[in-house]
A protein has these predicted regions:
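Phosphate-binding/switch region of NTP-binding enzymes
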Residues: 67-182
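Cytosolic-facing regulatory segments adjacent to core modules
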Residues: 1-43, 57, 163-165
């Protein structure tokens, strides 16, 4: 059966997850080094941090903006030192919710939460956006396509910025190529 095959494939895949709360940069580095030094395991090829703002510096700090700046700077250094790409997910500020006056809630770099250093240190910044999410706030009452989304390439240090149209499958919480047939 397909489910059993997929489960087996994922179980045996070289994917390492750590759901430690409040993990610090030194802890992440140590865990990556431990895995990379184990001859029985594949080296880490990608690090994904789900929610940058849950990380800590490992030191006491009363200024969250400075702490996030330190984290993003150290993530950049770690990516170069360990030769591994890092994807860090971040929350947007509430300002994007209040942008109804200009009839567009499309996120901008200035909407990244807690620090301008996220924008500064990142090589690439992507935003996912769906018009249908804000349809009830649409002042002109225009219909929006619930099956479409956008990937906004807001920053690209090594290439162009643009907006890429995507398909949206809300029933499965899945973004896909617009030409993908369900």
């Amino acid at each position: 059966n397909d489910f059993a095959q997929a489960t087996s494939l994922l179980y045996n895949a070289p994917i390492y997850m750590d759901d430690s709360s409040g993990i610090s940069m030194p802890e992440i580095k140590a865990k990556i080094r431990t895995i990379n030094q184990d001859p029985k395991k594949e080296k880490i090829g990608l690090v994904i941090i789900d929610y940058l703002q849950l990380m800590t510096t490992g030191q006491r700090s009363e200024n969250r903006v400075q702490e996030i700046s330190s984290i993003t700077r150290n993530l950049k250094i770690m990516a170069k030192e360990m030769n591994v790409p890092i994807i860090a997910l971040s929350q947007l500020s509430r300002a994007v919710e209040k942008q109804g006056n200009n009839s567009s809630h499309r996120p901008q770099l200035s909407d990244l939460r807690d620090s301008g250093s996220i924008e500064q240190d990142a090589d690439c910044v992507l935003f996912l956006y769906r018009d249908s999410y804000y349809a009830s706030q649409n002042p002109d009452g225009a219909e929006v396509d619930a099956d479409t989304a956008e990937c906004i390439v807001a920053k690209n240090r090594h290439g162009e910025t643009s907006t890429v149209p995507l398909g949206w499958d809300g029933a499965h919480t899945r973004f896909m190529d617009v030409d993908f047939k369900r």
